[in-house]
Regions:
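Soluble N-terminal domains of membrane-associated systems
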Residues: 1-102
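N-terminal charge/polar-biased segments
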Residues: 1-16, 118, 245-264
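C-terminal ends of transmembrane helices
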Residues: 114-115, 158-171, 216-229
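Cytosolic regulatory modules rich in charged/polar residues
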Residues: 35, 107-121, 173-174, 199-204
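Alpha-helical transmembrane segments and their cytosolic membrane-interface
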Residues: 79-147, 236-245
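Generic detector of multi-pass transmembrane helix bundles and their immediately adjacent loops
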Residues: 190-264
Length: 264
């Protein structure tokens, strides 16, 4: 369709519907809030004159219909990550569609494809972020400089392992448990070499795995009245926290058993 039409025909309506669903999926799988996904999709539908549009979003799925139930679509979103650059790009596209700056579905589809292709930060940036975050958290929790250095090394190792898991499709609880175990092992070895306590380094480095976003968004969903999505996110956060505890506890228990002393 060359221009935005007041009464798009059936083929155009289907195309608009597919575009809106793709935009919602992009938002949801990159860390946007549930209510924000619904709001953005409704704005796009109204701007493209897709009448009687209704959408219901969960943390892992989108259900939408348009017209008198003549069109309906379901999208499964099993994979969720955090890429706020893509979220911001889709939100900006939504505002431009509403203002008329993006006036055709062709341009909107092109812009959405560009937003979906925004890359993640380079590997060295993620490694540096893990190193800096672990170092700072170790100091915040009362560790000395030696503990901070051990935590920094563990942070690099953890992020390198997470990058490896991402490229080979390793996910779920196993990834979190194994990463927490790797962090604990690296901190114990590093602190033993440097002659300092391992507890501050372990706690500081484990903070980079803490599900803060999932927990915060779960609370926000509850505040918004979406109890189902809030419950799902809270359970997700609790499972991640439990996986972290299992991984760290296994290594510390094994170390204490082998050495005959408690890890401090």
């Amino acid at each position: 369709m060359a221009e935005r039409e007041l009464y798009p025909d059936g083929e155009q309506r289907r195309r608009i519907m597919d575009f809106i669903m793709a935009a919602g999926q992009t938002l949801l799988e990159n860390g946007a809030e549930v209510f924000r996904v619904e709001q953005t999709m409704e704005i796009m539908a109204a701007s493209f004159h897709l009448r009687e549009f209704h959408v219901y979003v969960l943390t892992n799925g989108i259900f939408a219909s348009a017209g008198t139930a003549e069109m309906s679509e379901v999208r499964n979103v099993p994979t969720r990550t955090t890429h706020l650059g893509r979220v911001a790009a889709v939100n900006q596209l939504s505002r431009q569609i509403a203002s008329g700056e993006v006036d055709t579905i062709d341009e909107a589809e092109t812009r959405l494809a560009q937003a979906r292709c925004i890359p993640f930060p380079k590997d060295w940036v993620q490694l540096a972020a893990g190193m800096g975050g672990a170092f700072c958290f170790a100091l915040i929790f009362g560790g000395d400089l030696k503990a901070g250095l051990a935590a920094a090394a563990a942070g690099v190792a953890a992020n390198a392992y997470l990058l490896f898991c991402g490229r080979h499709g390793v996910g779920g609880g196993f990834r979190t448990i194994s990463t927490a175990a790797l962090i604990t092992l690296c901190c114990i070895l590093g602190c033993s070499l440097l002659g300092t306590e391992a507890s501050h380094a372990i706690i500081g480095t484990l903070m980079i795995l803490t599900p803060g976003i999932a927990f915060t968004m779960g609370i926000r969903d509850f505040v918004q009245g979406d109890y189902l999505s809030g419950t799902i996110r809270m359970i997700d956060a609790l499972l991640i926290a439990a996986s972290i505890a299992i991984g760290a506890g296994l290594v510390q228990s094994l170390y204490a058993y082998l050495k005959g002393v408690a890890v401090v």
